């Protein structure tokens, strides 16, 4: 170390490294995404959206930003492709979280989905300095229906997708709060976790605000990015599903269901609830 020829290049290289961003503890950012492409050793991603999310976590670690990731643990992950007689086939490989780079946390989250209560445990992955929390409903306390909520990434019908998105959004907030986090900002990587706004709205309405006032209040804390602004890349839910799963939320807000649905319906379109529109408005 006394040899300047050795230490000077190291000092020069270190000086070129950007200084870490120092934020206060109360400025934690919670980054919600349906997939995280951190490593092939943690197969919880499909493609570009997940790779982007994984890179965000790694960059946050490098810059020492107080960011945490929140998503779902998919026991069967995303399908793998195989060819049989020239035709594509899909197959799934079951992932045992205890054999992955995951640690069980003490958090347990309960969420009512329509008329059923589902419980989720929370796994933690360390991405450098950044923490990633993944909710998993494959618990014996749940019935078979409940255990399948977090089974696969981007599979199932629209109702299955709605259950997953309610779990990720509403359940995700409850999970990280149990673990001691109170984020200043919530970053939505696409609209899949947009239902987290329901939990935030309920808290503000509980303080005496109207729904419209609550929307203005939570808007200060939500950041939304969309990467595929085309119909095929945006989740849309039919009115019957919205009434089935969000009717209880309208009651909590003290409004009729139509007033809640207006937050996600585009003018001149059909009556389906558009998650991108909802996330932009809140």
Give the residues covered by each predicted segment.
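Catalytic cores of carbohydrate-active enzymes across secretory and cytosolic contexts
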Residues: 1-282
């Amino acid at each position: 170390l006394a040899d300047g020829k050795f230490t000077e290049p190291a000092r020069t290289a270190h000086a070129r490294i950007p200084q870490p961003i120092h934020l206060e503890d109360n400025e934690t950012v919670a980054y919600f995404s349906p997939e995280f492409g951190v490593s092939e050793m943690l197969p919880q991603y499909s493609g570009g959206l997940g790779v982007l999310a994984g890179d965000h976590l790694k960059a946050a670690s490098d810059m020492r930003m107080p960011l945490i990731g929140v998503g779902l643990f998919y026991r069967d992950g995303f399908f793998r492709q195989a060819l049989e007689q020239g035709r594509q086939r899909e197959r799934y490989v079951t992932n045992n979280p205890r054999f992955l780079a995951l640690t069980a946390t003490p958090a347990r989250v309960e969420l009512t989905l329509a008329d059923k209560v589902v419980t989720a445990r929370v796994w933690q992955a360390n991405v450098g300095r950044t923490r990633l929390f993944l909710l998993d409903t494959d618990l014996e306390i749940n019935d078979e229906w409940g255990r399948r909520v977090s089974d696969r990434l981007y599979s199932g019908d629209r109702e299955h997708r709605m259950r997953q998105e309610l779990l990720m959004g509403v359940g995700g907030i409850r999970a990280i709060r149990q673990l001691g986090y109170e984020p200043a900002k919530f970053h939505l990587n696409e609209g899949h976790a947009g239902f987290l706004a329901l939990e935030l709205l309920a808290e503000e309405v509980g303080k005496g605000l109207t729904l419209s006032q609550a929307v203005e209040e939570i808007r200060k804390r939500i950041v939304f990015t969309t990467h595929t602004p085309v119909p095929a890349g945006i989740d849309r839910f039919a009115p019957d599903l919205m009434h089935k799963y969000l009717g209880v939320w309208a009651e909590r807000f003290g409004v009729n269901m139509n007033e809640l649905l207006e937050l996600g319906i585009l003018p001149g379109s059909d009556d389906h609830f558009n998650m991108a529109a909802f996330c932009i408005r809140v």
